[in-house]
């Protein structure tokens, strides 16, 4: 949303610059229409590029990241987004209400960690286990379960495998909750501090 806002602001600013410089060149400096348009376009483009560059610089400064770090985090976020699409697809292939609810809960937590990191990229370092391990395991096992459960005839071995997969997914749901807690670490600490302060003031 913030990126779209910056794009909109600098698009409007560069358009206004194009019109102003174009008119100034044509009427004020007696340039030809062609040159006036060229000067206007060049000025508008320069304003737009400078504005976007400055917005990015301020964003990186705010989150205390280098350009290389942010590019790396964006790459991981894009990979996570693609895995979320796979997880959502597997969600609707669940054959039981119980598995549908469990998959929906996992997707909810995954999405929350993803959005939290997208909003505040530096949180990526607090949720590295999620991006490097947990998410992959969740997606692969959920897809595996969806595939195996689609078999019309289930042997004893297949039923056991499905049962083991359900148990593992339950454990992974708990790990996702831990990853979310880790990603929200400072917010939880701040909330606890505020709660302690409120309790202390009530005792007075």
From Swiss-Prot:
Molecular function in Gene Ontology: hydrolase activity
Database matches in InterPro entries: ChloroindolylP_hydrolase
Domain of life: Bacteria
Keywords assigned: Hydrolase
Job of this protein: In double copy it causes aberrant cell morphology, filamentation and inhibits sporulation. Hydrolyzes 5-bromo-4-chloroindolyl phosphate.
Protein name in UniProt: Protein XpaC
Gene responsible for this protein: xpaC
């Amino acid at each position: 949303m913030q990126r779209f806002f910056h794009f909109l602001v600098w698009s409007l600013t560069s358009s206004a610059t194009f019109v102003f410089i174009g008119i100034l060149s044509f009427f004020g400096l007696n340039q030809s229409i062609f040159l006036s348009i060229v000067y206007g376009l060049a000025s508008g483009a320069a304003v737009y590029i400078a504005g976007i560059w400055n917005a990015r610089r301020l964003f990186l400064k705010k989150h205390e990241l280098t350009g290389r770090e942010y590019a790396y985090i964006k790459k991981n976020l894009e990979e996570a987004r693609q895995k979320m699409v796979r997880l959502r697809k597997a969600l609707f292939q669940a054959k039981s209400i119980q598995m549908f609810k469990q998959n929906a809960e996992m997707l909810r937590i995954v999405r929350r960690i993803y959005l939290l990191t997208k909003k505040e990229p530096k949180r990526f370092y607090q949720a590295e286990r999620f991006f490097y391990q947990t998410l992959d395991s969740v997606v692969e096992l959920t897809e595996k379960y969806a595939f195996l459960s689609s078999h019309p005839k289930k042997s004893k071995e297949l039923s056991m495998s499905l049962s083991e997969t359900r148990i593992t997914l339950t454990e992974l749901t708990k790990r996702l909750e831990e990853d979310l807690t880790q990603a929200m670490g400072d917010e939880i600490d701040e909330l606890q501090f505020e709660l302690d302060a409120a309790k202390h003031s009530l005792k007075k």
